[in-house]
Amino acid sequence: MDISFKVENQKFNYRVCAVILSENQILAMHDERSPYFYLPGGRVKMSETAEQAVIREVWEELSVTPKIDRPLWLNQAFFTEDVDGLRYHELCLYFLMDISDTDLTQRGPVFTLTEGTHTHTFEWLAFDRLKDAYFYPIFLKKEIYNLPNVLTVRAEFE
């Protein structure tokens, strides 16, 4: 069971994201439900560590098993979701991933994979393209140039 619950018109999520980089580009995705780019990842399940969750989510979405380099951020986000209109309180752990033992960089600049009933389109976005892209999380548009060496706690209000 995902660690996510709804109270009236608000929703709490505990999730993880994979920061996957190659040559000043970040791997982002979108699907038929979302007009914006976002990072691979998803909700943490009960009795699952964040590390287990990020590896599982990357496997489910990309069919590869990367290694975790290090945790980057614990982001406390407060926002209204563009798709469902709910007000979210989200805790998300962002992990820098090591993809050296995967084929992700050989899949091309844009590629598509299916997960269940959803089709995900993945795209390698140049760092300098993020500032003008419809991309979440917003803080990453600037922070991508200055990745922390230790886990950093932050808050984002929208």
Predicted regions and their residues:
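Short, P/G- and charge-enriched loop/turn segments at secondary-structure junctions
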Residues: 1-8, 81-85, 110-112
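Acidic, metal-coordinating catalytic segment for phosphate/diphosphate chemistry
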Residues: 1-19, 23
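A generic structural micro-feature
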Residues: 8-12, 85-91, 114-119
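Conserved Nudix-box catalytic region and its N-terminal flanking loop in Nudix hydrolases
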Residues: 22-61
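Short, charged/polar surface micro-motifs in flexible loops or helix N-caps
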Residues: 24-26, 34, 45, 74-79, ...
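Nudix hydrolase/Nudix homology domain
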Residues: 35-37, 103-158
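A short coil-to-beta-strand element that immediately follows conserved catalytic motifs
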Residues: 65-74
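Active-site-adjacent beta-strand/loop module that shapes the phosphate/pyrophosphate-binding cleft
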Residues: 79-107, 143
